[in-house]
């Protein structure tokens, strides 16, 4: 989907804002954006989830990857991967046909800002205490989770109910990651 000129300008401004900021204060700056993203996901609902009960599916969210990662340095790459995968999922042409374009553009902007915030922290190397293998295993688990979601959408031929089930699943997983971010902030 071609992004509108206004969205491109917004992305450029957000990119400059995050690259010009000093320090990595992720839990404070990132949590509000996560809440806005959740609100946008809720607003994107087009049909009742109750009408799609037959399409429910357990995607196997890798909750242990988020439940066991209590240090910021261990969590940031996993959160980054999750948000990148959400961005990729909702950036497809099949996705743009399923959602209101204005809400989708706002959603992209929020995700893009969060990706920039996380990338700034990764670049700064916020404490490299985890083993690379643990981080890679966690990132791989997130990628497999999103592969299952993508496969489900293909099998359901990107139906409105399939997208609604996926939207609800993304809200649930995003909410869990937001709770993790808030617990990180409270530990600082």
From Swiss-Prot:
Signal peptide: 1-23
UniProt gene name: IFNA2
UniProt xrefs under SUPFAM superfamilies: 4-helical cytokines
UniProt-listed InterPro entries: 4_helix_cytokine-like_core, Interferon_alpha/beta/delta
Principal location listed in the UniProt entry: secreted
Cystines in this chain: 24-121, 52-161
Gene3D superfamilies for the chain: 1.20.1250.10
Official protein name in the record: Interferon alpha-2
Source organism: Homo sapiens (Human)
């Amino acid at each position: 989907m071609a992004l509108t000129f206004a969205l491109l300008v917004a992305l450029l401004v957000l990119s400059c804002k995050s690259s010009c900021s000093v320090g990595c204060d992720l839990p404070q700056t990132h949590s509000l954006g996560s809440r806005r993203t959740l609100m946008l996901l809720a607003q994107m609902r087009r049909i009742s989830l109750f009408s799609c009960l037959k399409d429910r599916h357990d995607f196997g969210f890798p909750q242990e990857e988020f439940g066991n990662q209590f240090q910021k340095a261990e969590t940031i790459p996993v959160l980054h991967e999750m948000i990148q995968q959400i961005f990729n999922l909702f950036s497809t042409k099949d996705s743009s046909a399923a959602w209101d374009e204005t809400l989708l553009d706002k959603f992209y902007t929020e995700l893009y800002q969060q990706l920039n915030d996380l990338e700034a922290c990764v670049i700064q190397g916020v404490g490299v205490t985890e083993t690379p293998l643990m981080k890679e295993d966690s990132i791989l688990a997130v990628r497999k989770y999103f592969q299952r979601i993508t496969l489900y959408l293909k099998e359901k031929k990107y139906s409105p109910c399939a997208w609604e089930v996926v939207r609800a699943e993304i809200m649930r997983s995003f909410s869990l990651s937001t709770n993790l971010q808030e617990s990180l902030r409270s530990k600082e």
